[in-house]
Amino acid sequence: MVKLVDVNIEVLSDRLEKSLGGKNPKEPETPKGPSSEELNFVRILYSTLLKNEVSEQYVNQILGEIEKFIRPGHSVDTILSNVYQKLILRFGQPKSLDLSGAKPHVVFFIGPTGVGKTTTIAKIASKYKVDYEKKVAFITADTYRIAATEQLQVYANILDAPMSIVYSKEELNEAIEKYAEYDLVFVDTAGFSHKNEEQKEDIRNLIQGVDPEYTSEVYLVLSATTKYRDLLDIVDTYRTISEFKLIFTKLDETSTYGNLLNIKLYSDAELSYTTNGQNVPDDIELFDTQKIVKQLLGGNS
C-alpha cells in the first residue's frame, strides 16, 4: 500500500497507545464488530478533526462512513488511510485558470475587504506572464479605495502591463475590447460587507454585464483566518452574484485548516489557489490537497 499518510500515523498511533494505557485490548474470541482499539482510534480522529476546526457536521459524516466500513482486524493505518482518501475526494480536483475559449479570457476576483484580492491578482498575473509568457492586462472596478487602484497600478507597471479603471459595465466592455489581443484580463472588484446590498448589486451587474462573446470566470477570494460563521455568510452573499471558484489566502496566518474543507463542502465550489504570504509572485500555489489533508489529520506538511 502506498504510504500516503506516514507523517500522521506516528502521531495518531502514539495518541492511541496513550489512550489505551500502553496496553493492547484483548480481542474477543469471535469478533463481531470493531475492536476497542479501532473505536478508540476513530475517536482520536474525531478529536483531531474537531481540533483543526472541521465542522462537527462534516466530521460526523466522514467518520460515520468509516465506522460502517470497519471490520474486525482492520489496522489503524488502514482506517487512517480510508479517512485520508475520503477527505481527498471531498476536496476534489483543484483547478487553475481555464484558458479555453477565445481571447481575451476575463478573470474576475470578488470577495470581502482585507482578504488580499489585489495581491492575489498580482501573483497569478505574474506567474502567467513570466512562467507561461501570456499577455496580461488589468482592469480595476474598485473605485471605492484609491489605495487599491494605486496598488494594482504598481503591479501593472512592474509587469509592463496595461491597466484601465472602469465605473460601469459599459466601460468594462470597452476596456475588454481594447485588450482583445491579450490572453488574460484580470478584473479587480471592490470588497464590501456582505450586508451591503448596493455594492453587491454593483458587482453583480458588472459580472453579468460582460459581453457573452468574451470567456470569463469568477474567483471568490477568502481569508483562511475568517471565522466559520462569517465565511458562511460571505459565501451566501457572493453565490447570489455568480458561480465561482475558491481561492484561500493567508494560510500562513492560521494553524487550523478546517474551514477550507468546511467551505468547500458548504459551497460545492471548485478549489483553485492558496496563498501563504505577501511575496509576489512566490507565495501562491495551486491548492495542495494532500498537504492540507495531512495537516487536518494532525501531521506536518
Give names to the regions the model predicted.
Residues 112, 136-147, 158-172, 179-202:
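Switch II (G3) loop of P-loop NTPases
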